[in-house]
Amino acid sequence: MKSSKLHLLTCSLLTLLLISCSEDNRADHAAQYPPNTSQKADTKFLRFTDESRGEGVMEAAIATYEGKNGEKVELISAVHVADTAYYERLEKLFAGYDSVLYELIKAKGVKPPEKGRRKRGESGGMVSWFQRYMRDTLQLDFQLEAIDYRAKNFVHADLDAETFQRLSEERGETIVQLMLKLALAEFKISKEGKSKTDQNIGLKLIAALFMPDSARALKYLFAQQLENMESLMAGLGEGPDGKGSVLLTERNKKCMSVLRERLKRGDKNIGVFYGGAHMADLEKRIFKEIGFRRTGVRWEQAWVVRRAEQTPAKKPAKK
């Protein structure tokens, strides 16, 4: 049961991260200000409020950072499958930025997917299958289907597929290797008694599948576990060689390179729309590389888990 639990968690973590470098050109885009050493990079970017009885709210953070000349950068923690209302609110928010830097590993020259387009019937491997499962079973929307990535102010700030593959091959980094690394990290945390993972998650998942309101029950279980994702995924930004992973570290380097380019171009209000697992490392880089200060954190509801209201049974008509 424990091995199946770990397999489920690691597959889920990597899948959510993958939905969605070349060397860091720091010399070309040097930080405008000295490093911010007065603040600690400890922002929490995902939280679940358990309201008991199988209900609760999962929220994603939007953290604001400001430079001395009025520049503003916001880290918008993305939840890749979420309630429709969450994406509708984000779309309104995005319209107000000079530029929105987004994550998406795609081939060079290929446009991002059109909003609302679904590719049912295509296999796409394990990742695509899991995406469809999450969307359909949990009755949620996909980020790539609900957000207009072709908006004029959207700027690609991720590795292209060719670079990602090349760097991964150079380092011998595979999905299996990363899944094993995450599983070992979870095992270590569990052994130290610090794990937040429900030891009975496997049984609860099976039970949830057979509930009349299975979508609500499964959303509740997944939401409880997603908080644990941040600390586990942060481990991918570390490594014995100090280089971190391609999946997280190199993509974040690319994102920061594009961010410096946009600041150099004169953008004053920039949104960075990246998965929550990337945010802890991105915050560190914002402090260290461009010297901005964190000035606030606000929250957006991504999943609202509620039981359906019970409709009172109709009284039989009087004869």
Which functions belong to the PLM regions below?
Residues 18-20:
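C-terminal motif of bacterial Sec signal peptides marking the signal peptidase cleavage site
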Residues 2-9:
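Bacterial N-terminal signal peptides that target proteins for export
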Residues 245, 249-319:
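A cross-kingdom marker for long, charged
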Residues 16, 68-70, 265, 289:
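Short, well-ordered coil/turn elements that cap or connect secondary structure elements
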Residues 8, 35-36, 313, 317:
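Generic low-complexity segments that are intrinsically disordered, proline-rich and/or Lys/Arg-biased
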Residues 25-250, 295-305:
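Structured, acidic catalytic/metal-binding patches in enzyme active sites
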